[in-house]
Amino acid sequence: MKQNQAMDFLELKHQKPEYANWVSMWIPLSGSLVTLLFAGAAALCAKSSALAAGLLTVAAIVAFAFTFYMLRARTALSYAGGGVQGKVLEDVLKTLDQAGFNGHGKLLDIGCGSGAMSIKAAKKYPRALITAMDYWGAGWDYSQRLCEHNAQVEKVASRITFRKGDAAKLDFMADTFDAAVSNFVFHEVRSQKDKHALVLEALRVLKPGGCFAFQDIFFAKSHYGDINAFVEALRPYVSEIHFVDTPRNSCPPRSFWGRWA
C-alpha cells in the first residue's frame, strides 16, 4: 500500500499541468487546410483561367496570414510560450483583491476552462474553498477530467470541486458564495443572449457583501451595447461596482468588479 502511494506521488511529481490554450488548435489546423485547398485550386486553374487562379491565390494568402496570426496568438497565450494567459488570470485575482475579498470562504469560478484560474485562486487563497464550473462544450480543448488532473498535479485538488453546468442557469442557491470570478466567458454563453441577465445570474449566487471580478470583451457592443449604460443598469443590484476601461489592444482587457448588495 505504502509502495503504491509512493509510486503515485512520484508520478505526480514528474507530471505537469496541461492548461489548454484559449485558441483551439483546430483554428490554425483548419486555416492550414483552407490555405492548402485554395493554393491547390489556384494551381489547377493556372492554365485555364488566370483570373480565377489570381483570386484563389489571394484567398490562399489571406488564409495563410490568418493561420499565421492565430499560431502566433496561440504561442503568446500559452504557458510554455508568452504566458499571456497566466498574466491575465493573475490580473483577475488582483482585481478581486481590490474588490475586498479576504481569501476566506467559498469562491466560484464561472467558466473554468482547463482549471487554470481555479488553481491559481486555490494557491493564492489557501483558506478558500473553490467551486469551478464549465459547460466544456465541443470545440474547446477543455474537460472536467483535465481540470481534475491539473488540480491534482498542482496539489490543490482537496480544495477545488469541478462540476459541469450552464452559466445562464447556475445550479446553486442564492447567497452561496463569498466571491465570484469569470474570465472571457460571458460572451461565449449562447444559452443566454441577454448579457445583463447573465451577469445578474452570476451575482445571484453571491452572499450579501460578496465580491466579484468579471473580465470579458466588454467593449463589444454586439454583446454588451453601451458598456457604461450596462454598468449603470447593474448598479441598483450591487453596493459597489467599478468598470476598468483599458485599450482594446492591451492585456488585460476590460473588466468590472465590486460587491453584491
Please describe what each predicted stretch is:
Residues 125, 189-190, 206-208:
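Helix-to-beta-strand junctions that scaffold the AdoMet/dcAdoMet cofactor pocket
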Residues 195-208:
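A short glycine-rich, Lys/Arg-flanked "PGG" loop and its adjoining helix->strand segment in the class I
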